[in-house]
Amino acid sequence: MSSQHFQGRFEVEFKYRLSDVDAFTCALAALNPEVMLEDNQEQDSYFDTPEHSLAAEGKSLVIRTMQPSGIQLWIVKGPEADRCEAVNITDADKAASMLRTLGYRQVLAISKRRSIYFVGPFHVTRDHLEGIGDFAELAIMTDDEALLPDYRQQLQDLATRLGLSSAQLETRSYRTLCEQSLTLNSEKVPS
């Protein structure tokens, strides 16, 4: 794993909804990316207080497990849109237990199939969320906040090279998309 791709306190990220996964995959292959992993199953467990105080502050606390790669992460996002920190952990179950001991509870679980590639300094993910859709995320992490505007432009240029348009841009987080889907599905269930 190229760990330098995932270091930093800030993350510039653009998410695109894919209408043609094969066309995107072909465009990505033409850039000769380095493959980190393909078709891993990720399970993201979101934790918050019973009062949802983290969500109210624009923060997310996530324990992520990835199989078959075996990667386990503790992730904190927010409150700023570009703020994201992650650290490798060795026991996701123990970390979740510790959070519950501290009064947090799991408020959402998201499963996705993810492939991660590197194109120069950028990481490109191809994600599938059952019932939600297919997405590409283009991102870079840094500790230097002054670089964020330049990285935004470079990622938009990369998106163009990958055949992605601003019409495909998805500004909602996977958490929001899943919560909205759950709300819609619960409204469809007859009482």
UniProtKB/Swiss-Prot annotation:
Q: Which GO terms describe its molecular function?
A: adenylate cyclase activity; ATP binding
Key word Cytoplasm present = yes
The active site of this protein is located at 46
| GO terms under biological process | cAMP biosynthetic process
**What is this enzyme's EC?**
4.6.1.1
* EC class name: lyase
Q: How does activity depend on temperature?
A: Optimum temperature is 65 degrees Celsius.
Query: What is this enzyme's catalytic activity, as reactions?
Result: ATP = 3',5'-cyclic AMP + diphosphate
Query: How might one describe the regulation of this protein's activity?
Result: Inhibited by GTP.
Residue ranges of the CYTH domain? 9-180
User: What happens without the gene?
Assistant: Cells lacking this gene show no impair of cAMP biosynthesis.
What start and end residues bound the annotated signal peptide?
none
GO cellular component labels: cytoplasm
Q: Chief localization class?
A: cytoplasm
Q: How does activity depend on pH?
A: Optimum pH is 9.5.
Query: Which keywords describe this protein according to UniProt?
Result: ATP-binding, cAMP biosynthesis, Cytoplasm, Lyase, Nucleotide-binding
Described by its record, this protein's role is as follows: In vitro, CyaB catalyzes the biosynthesis of cyclic AMP (cAMP) from ATP. It seems that under the physiological conditions CyaB has no function in cAMP processes. In vitro, it is also able to hydrolyze substrates such as thiamine triphosphate (ThTP) and inorganic triphosphate (PPPi) at a low rate. It has a slight preference for ThTP over ATP and PPPi in the presence of manganese ions. This PPPase activity is probably not of physiological importance.
Note the PANTHER family from the entry: CYTH DOMAIN-CONTAINING PROTEIN (PTHR21028:SF2), SI:CH211-156B7.4 (PTHR21028)
Q: State the family it belongs to.
A: Belongs to the adenylyl cyclase CyaB family.
Q: What is this protein called?
A: Adenylate cyclase CyaB
| Underlying gene | cyaB
